[in-house]
Each structure stands twice: as C-alpha cells, then as structure tokens.
Regions:
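Short Pro-Gly-centered beta-turn/loop motif in secreted/extracellular proteins
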Residues: 73-89, 163-187
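Extracellular beta-sheet/turn segments enriched in Thr/Pro/Gly and aliphatic residues
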Residues: 106-125, 129, 196-217
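Short, acidic Ser/Thr/Gly-rich low-complexity loop/linker segments typical of extracellular
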Residues: 55-76, 154-170
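Compositionally biased low-complexity segments at domain edges in trafficked proteins
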Residues: 122-151, 215-217
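Short, ordered, surface-exposed loop/turn motifs in non-cytosolic proteins
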Residues: 38-59, 136-156
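Bacterial Sec-dependent N-terminal signal peptides
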Residues: 1-40
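A short, amphipathic beta-strand motif
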Residues: 29-35, 75, 126-135
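A short, solvent-exposed loop/turn motif at the edges and junctions
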Residues: 82-112, 189-198
Length: 217
C-alpha cells in the first residue's frame, strides 16, 4: 500500500465514521400499548413525547413537544427526534374510550443513537352515578354516610372519602369517571342517636357504560 493510498483509506474511514454518527444522533423512543384489563394490543393510540430542556445553562421549566406517533395494528409505536439537553421527559398515551395515561421517563437514559423502550397500558373508562335519596321523615339528628372503598377515579371531584348527608337534605346525586371493568366496593351508614346501621356491597362498572347506584334511607 502506497503512502497516498494509506492516507486516503484513513480519510475515508474517518468520513464514514462521522457520517454514521450523524445518522444515529437522534433520540428514539419505542414500545407497545395494550389494554390494561385484557392485555390486548391497542391500535390508533395517540402517542405524545414531551421534554423539558436545559438551554443556555438555565432550566426552562415547561414541557415542549418532542415528537408524536400513532400505534400500528399491533399496538407498537416509534418516535424519533433531534437530541437535546433533556432534564425531564414524559410520554402520554390517549385513545377514545380509555383514560389518558402519562409515564415519566428517565432523562439520563436518552443517548444519541440509542433506542429506549417504554410500554404503555391504558385502562378503559366508565362512569358511575350515585343517587342518595331520603324516602321519608327522619329525626333531625340522623345522618347518612357514604363512601367507595377501592375506587380508582379519574376526576378531581371524586375520591374514597366519606360523603355525609344530613336529614335536612332530601337527596344528593353525583357522577364520577372511573377505571372500567371493575367491581367498586362501597359502604354506607345510617347514623341515628345511639345507633348506627351500616351496609357493605359492590357494583360492577363495565367499560364505556354509565352504572347507576341508588341508595335510599
């Protein structure tokens, strides 16, 4: 090998390596999305990847869109975007009939050219309406206490805390968005002076349905 040929070989090697690095400089997030109840693959799920950046030595403090995609028929997705100084990252999966879910990602896991995997599972949505009705005249000191005991809610208005209804209230109705295809356990108490009568039961909330729970006291 002549001297000129040797240097040409070295130059081409460096150029090829540089180009290869340039090709692989992007961040890549991939994975699959399934139904959290049935484990079936979900297609047409909207995938949104967001990031917070460190720019000019300062922390931006807000999320910006890094990339987006839609899952295939097999539930898989792949998002690729330009690498940057990420300090926080998250991926969101959303689909009609399901509760939107956000996954926080490790910013340090992202390296240029590497493919990071993150699978998502979405819960089907359901709604429940609770009707608490007083059927007759009750003593002034009587009170109805009601609560769910194991519900997973997707609205700020609902939780598993007690709801207390006094005898001055004729009826009370409220509705909550919950994780579907599950049995919700509940308990209610009718509190009279010197006596408390309670009942425990459950109601099934099927996906994409409104379940109605009527309690009379």
């Amino acid at each position: 090998m002549t001297k000129s040929t040797y240097f040409l070989f070295i130059a081409l090697t460096i150029l090829f390596t540089h180009c290869k690095k340039e090709e692989n400089k992007n961040f890549v997030l991939k994975g699959s999305v399934t139904d959290a109840r049935s484990n079936a693959a979900l297609n047409n799920v909207n995938i949104l990847v967001e990031q917070q950046l460190l720019e000019g030595g300062s922390f931006g403090g807000f999320f910006s869109t890094a990339g987006s995609a839609t899952t295939s028929g097999g539930g898989s997705y792949r998002v690729e975007w330009d690498n940057a100084n990420i300090v926080e990252a998250r991926v969101t999966g959303s689909l009609a009939g399901y509760i939107t879910r956000v996954y926080n990602l490790s910013a340090s896991a992202f390296q240029p050219g590497d493919e990071i995997s993150q699978n998502l599972s979405l819960y089907p949505e359901a709604n429940i309406q609770v009707n608490l009705s007083k059927t007759g005249v009750v003593p002034n000191a009587t009170q109805l206490n009601f609560r769910f005991e194991n519900a997973e809610f997707d609205c700020l208005c609902c939780n598993n805390n007690w709801r207390n209804i006094t005898s001055s209230v004729t009826d009370s109705t409220y509705e909550c968005r919950v994780y579907g295809d599950t049995w919700l356990k509940y308990r209610y108490e009718v509190v009279n002076p010197g006596e408390t009568v309670f009942m425990r039961d459950s109601i099934f909330c099927g996906r994409n349905n409104l379940s109605i729970l009527n309690i009379q006291w």
